[in-house]
Amino acid sequence: MKAVEFLKYVLDSVNMPEDIKKLNIGQLNRLALELRSFVLENVSKTGGHLASNLGIVELTLALHYCFDAPKDKIVWDVGHQAYIHKILTGRKDKFTTLRQLDGLSGFPKPSESEYDTFTAGHSSTSISIALGFACARDMRGSDEKVVAVIGDGSLTGGVAFEALNNAGRSNSNIIVVLNDNQMSISGNVGALSRHLGELRTERGYIEAKNDVKKLLNRFPDSEKMVNKIKRTKNRIKYLFIPGVIFEELGFKYIGPVDGNNIESLIEVINRAKNIEGPVLIHVKTKKGKGYKYAENNPSAYHGVSAFDLSTGASIKKSNKPTYSDVFGKTMCSMADEDDKIVAVSAAMGNGTGLSKFISKHPSRFYDVGIAEQHAVSFSAALAKSGFRPVFAVYSTFLQRAYDEIMQDVCLQNLHVVFAVDRAGIVGADGETHQGIYDISYFTHMPNMTVMMPKNGIELEKMLRYAVYNIDGPVAVRYPRG
């Protein structure tokens, strides 16, 4: 039998998570290759989130291999990386309808499948949701496992740290998988890191630590002795062990782990399942893995329209400039003439059309991460200091910062310009991304001016008018495309 035929057989024989559990490591690795080909073939036609899904194949396989969904709950942060999960949970044959009318959603959707534990679309909430599930389980007295899968980008959102802080104090059995596919949260220091990560989670280590405590308690002044040992241990941890921040929050930390190695992932996840209390597994994956164009430029292949699989080039229906293009060009033009112009983004610089601005005026571009609330208050202080901040943001994400818009901008009548992209109906991204709520909350805020251009020419004029002719807060809202 040829290798290609065998690969087809592996994918053809897998429809539900229980099918994965019958495979050996070699077959799982072959299945990972086949899944990447399957995703590429389909997303090149339908469009969707590509690079993140190519990077998370092995991790998704390992999660479904080790856990018993839907009894065990897997909570996906944002959810745009859940394509493999959908394929493995009975939706393979519907995958050609991804993001189409009456087709599969591009995000987890409980009404679509019981394997989708929670509706997702916005970032940084998975740990909060998982902790809620875990506490509900504890009150019921049931025994299901609860896992949150969150990316390093989502970890820049403040709500994720609020949840980590709460989860660490709860001592509830919860596993957080940190999918690190871009920024290095902590460097992999090789064999020592792996050894310490394994050592600290082994039952023998935990029992030995408890035995030492009992022994020390027999001596006079044992408390002072224990405290000295703890201080020494903590100094060593800060020098050698990655992930100390998570340990300080109350988590047992395992990692970094190769997130594209199925065998290692299965071993680590199975070990984590048997640890009492909150556990964080730090996995490092390669965004865009298996498709050279996405590997070389993962940001460009984060969200894609239909494209030519052989060249990676987008199949555009029109070469007409988009509203985002016009916005970016106008921002560059104004910044060329005015050194008070500042652009602010919440991890969406490229998506909002600011690529050229970033290249031409890097010192006046601030990407604050997935932190819309922070971005608004940050922009308010820039305005208070005499600058002209323009916060470029998708409508659906700006609603997360309602309180800051009201308190920090509008009530103080500060001149912050909100460039509200993807306003109105956005189509394929579904109900979690529609930009249909901003008008209702903008128009009841004091001092706010709302402007809506009908074309690119009006957008340029309105943006300039908003920056130079209005003293208070302004929202310029424009659609996708």
Question: What are these regions, as identified by a protein language model?
Answer:
Residues 425-481:
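Active-site phosphate/pyrophosphate-binding segments
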Residues 125-149, 154-195, 200, 207-210, ...:
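Hydrophobic, small-residue-rich alpha-helical packing segments that form membrane-like cores
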Residues 93-107, 169-186, 197, 204-207, ...:
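A glycine-rich helix N-cap at a beta->alpha junction
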Residues 73, 285-399, 404-413:
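Non-catalytic terminal/interface segments that mediate subunit docking, oligomerization
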Residues 84-90, 155-164, 185-197, 266-268, ...:
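Short acidic, glycine/serine/threonine-rich loops at helix termini
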Residues 2-89, 245-267, 275-285:
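N-terminal amphipathic, basic-rich helices that act as targeting or association modules
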Residues 49-170, 340-341, 346, 354-355:
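Cofactor-binding active-site loop characterized by glycine-rich and histidine/acidic residues
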Residues 2, 11, 182-327:
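Long, well-ordered, tryptophan-enriched scaffold segments
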